């Protein structure tokens, strides 16, 4: 993905003969040293991708190194990125991924300078380089590694200067957070107001339209948080039951962690409702009216209520962060793990175990939602991480519209962006201790579903990769802020004095010089039409009916239970509750009896032939038609090679995603193999060389 925009240059002394884009550059360097780029080469190469506001801070000739790689070129530092331009390289316009030679400053996770065999300095923002480096290693947060070696001689000062430029650029980037919704150059070509490709859920109309799409007739849009005075981490609007007044919503939300009370996440067509909320604020002292309002919101008009303890059997944030760090270290090109021990090391990261846990938990919740008409409430203390992950996975398993390209983007916007997932904190851009790649974990889970059910998803692996890469690309505020309130405040949409919120895509007043702030869904401003076309999965079958996977035919699976049946789902167990709220009588919160919810012994496909051990009054409960139940045992969980091994192109062969262009590439590769093997055919078989069967028999 290509990006750029406006920014500010840094207070770094310019190099002599510093090349400007399209202007004069350094002269060629005579002698045996590596030739320096000419002004035309450097200027034209950068001008093809640079946008107004990007400035070259420093550059140095070098060689990109790696397994079987020794590529001469130029290392360039700008106020937005670090890029390596190979000699004679031209930017390809049809690549669906970001250039392997470009690293956004915000994407650099680790910077190391090397001199000799043992002298290594870890360079943090603001560090002082203690020696002239012979090599520079940039470790990307997206599993890439840029290793550049510098030649000795007159180039040593340039190597020092480009390294210091990177250090200072990263420092100023982290201090002032210069990425303030960079305005892309193509925006200037758009006249008038620009309609967002995906509803950003910043207006009352957006929420009302989405509510109608889901058919949630018993729900309405609450405006109680329109000024962000109930919960700053929530959006200004959300769905609550029709019969609950906004005054009751305000009082009820005060008894939940960070004011994140129960609200609708998704309405199942069969009648069930999936809710999410934060943990109960035990220290509060609600009155009877407040407790009644909380219970009414949790029940959502249903007689059956199931509280799901989201974090049970799920990894902690620290576990996810540690697993991701181990995975990134394992997948780097310079990993020291022997090839015969690589799979064991991969298992030791536990990343795939955590993917498995998420899919298993989402499958359990999906059965709870579809088996009977009820209210299923996802409860997590902060309500900003795993509630969004599990809610999104449940909708992917149950809602065909969520598996479309438009639907998936809307799902992420609603359950992650508008719901206040702390992207900036979790993705490690603030240096906080709460770093954890929860959203990349969700993308891995979505990729697993795409591999297991390729005909069910309209989007392709290339789209998931583009979204994965967009996490740390500083052209929008979508993933660079923690809450909708922060995005609105930073972009000038929210007036802290008048408490007036202006939607991001509203038409500015006449004479206003405010820039148009983009969302991550404005793909056409960063990608060509050819690239966007690869976001679609050619194997998607919108008419595909998954009912054939289930042998049982059910006329009506969604039936009500007895009045006031309350349950807690934790660790695969349904436990009856005497009450929903913990403030009345905490000693009688849990009853002693419980019913086990069995898991499949060998494969999740066997769940279609099992009866789930739900409470007896619910009767026999076979799986409903249309429910996608992913496999999560053993080799059913696969390794996302195209994402995590992108820094090792030698292992990417044969891992093409399912796109038309990928099939063409595979065909070209097979034709090349045939051409290589054709000379090996014996002379007496030359007359038969046009027969494909003869050629294939020679190959085998």
Swiss-Prot record:
| Residue numbers spanned by region Disordered | 1-39
| Family to which this protein belongs | Belongs to the protein-tyrosine phosphatase family. Non-receptor class myotubularin subfamily.
Looking at the record's lineage, which domain of life comes first? Eukaryota
Q: Which Pfam families match?
A: 3-PAP, Myotub-related
Where does the Myotubularin phosphatase domain start and stop, copy by copy? 201-644
Protein name, UniProt field: Myotubularin-related protein 11
**Where is it found, in Gene Ontology cellular component terms?**
cytoplasm
Source organism? Mus musculus (Mouse)
């Amino acid at each position: 993905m290509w990006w750029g925009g406006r920014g500010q240059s840094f207070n770094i002394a310019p190099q002599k003969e510093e090349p400007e884009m399209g202007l004069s550059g350094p002269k060629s360097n005579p002698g045996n040293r590596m030739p320096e780029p000419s002004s035309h080469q450097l200027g034209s190469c950068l001008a093809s991708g640079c946008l107004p506001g990007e400035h070259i801070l420093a550059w140095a000739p070098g060689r990109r190194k790696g397994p079987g790689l020794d590529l001469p070129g130029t290392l360039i530092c700008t106020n937005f990125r670090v890029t390596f331009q190979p000699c004679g390289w031209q930017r390809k316009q049809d690549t669906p991924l970001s250039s392997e030679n470009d690293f956004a400053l915000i994407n650099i996770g680790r910077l190391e300078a090397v001199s000799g065999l043992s002298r290594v300095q870890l360079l943090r923002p603001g560090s002082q380089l203690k020696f002239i480096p012979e090599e520079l290693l940039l470790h990307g947060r997206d599993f890439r590694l840029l290793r550049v070696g510098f030649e000795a001689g007159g180039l040593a000062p340039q190597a020092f200067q480009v390294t210091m430029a990177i250090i200072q650029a990263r420092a100023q980037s982290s201090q002032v957070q210069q990425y303030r919704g960079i305005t892309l150059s193509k925006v200037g070509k758009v006249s008038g107001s620009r309609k967002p490709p995906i509803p950003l859920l910043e207006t009352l109309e957006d929420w009302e339209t989405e509510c109608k799409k889901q058919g949630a007739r018993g729900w309405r849009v609450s405006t109680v948080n329109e000024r962000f005075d109930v919960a700053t981490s929530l959006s200004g609007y959300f769905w609550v039951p029709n019969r609950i007044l906004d005054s009751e919503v305000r009082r009820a939300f005060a008894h939940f962690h960070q004011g994140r009370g129960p609200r609708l996440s998704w309405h199942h067509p069969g009648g069930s409702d999936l809710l999410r909320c934060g943990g109960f604020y035990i220290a509060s002292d609600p009155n009877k009216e407040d407790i009644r309002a909380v219970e009414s919101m949790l029940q959502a008009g249903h007689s059956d209520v199931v509280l799901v303890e989201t974090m049970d059997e799920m990894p902690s944030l620290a576990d996810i962060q540690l697993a991701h760090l181990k995975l990134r270290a394992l997948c780097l090109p310079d990993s020291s793990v022997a090839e015969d021990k690589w799979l064991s090391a991969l298992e030791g990261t536990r990343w795939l175990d955590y993917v498995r846990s998420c899919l298993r938990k989402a499958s359990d919740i999906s059965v709870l939602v579809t088996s009977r008409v009820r209210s299923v409430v996802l409860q997590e203390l902060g309500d900003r991480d795993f509630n969004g992950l599990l809610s999104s996975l449940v909708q992917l398993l149950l809602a065909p519209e969520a598996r479309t390209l438009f639907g998936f983007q809307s799902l992420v916007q609603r359950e992650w962006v508008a719901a206040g997932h702390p992207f900036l904190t979790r993705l490690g851009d603030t240096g906080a201790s709460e770093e954890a790649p929860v959203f990349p974990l969700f993308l891995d889970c979505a990729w697993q579903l795409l591999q297991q059910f390729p005909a069910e998803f309209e989007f392709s692996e290339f789209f998931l990769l583009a979204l994965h890469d967009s996490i740390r690309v500083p052209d929008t505020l979508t993933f660079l802020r923690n809450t909708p309130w922060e995005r609105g405040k930073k972009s000038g949409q929210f007036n802290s004095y008048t408490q007036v919120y202006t939607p991001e895509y509203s038409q500015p007043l006449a004479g206003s010089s405010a820039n148009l702030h983009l969302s991550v869904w404005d793909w056409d401003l960063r990608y060509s039409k050819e690239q966007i076309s690869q976001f679609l999965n050619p194997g998607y079958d919108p008419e595909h009916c998954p009912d054939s996977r289930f042998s049982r035919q059910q006329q009506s699976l969604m039936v009500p239970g007895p009045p006031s049946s309350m349950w807690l789902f934790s660790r695969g167990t349904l436990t009856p509750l005497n009450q929903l709220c913990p403030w009345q009588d905490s000693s009688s919160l849990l009853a002693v009896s419980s019913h086990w919810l069995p898991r499949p012994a060998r494969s999740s496909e066997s769940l279609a032939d099992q009866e789930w051990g739900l409470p007896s009054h619910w009767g026999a409960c076979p799986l409903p038609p249309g429910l996608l139940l992913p496999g999560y045992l053993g080799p059913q969980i696969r390794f996302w090679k195209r994402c995590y091994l992108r820094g090792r192109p030698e292992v990417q062969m044969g891992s093409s995603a399912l796109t038309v262009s990928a099939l063409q590439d595979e065909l070209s590769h097979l034709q090349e193999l045939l051409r290589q093997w054709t000379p090996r055919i014996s002379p007496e078989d030359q007359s038969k060389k046009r027969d494909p069967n003869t050629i294939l028999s020679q190959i085998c």
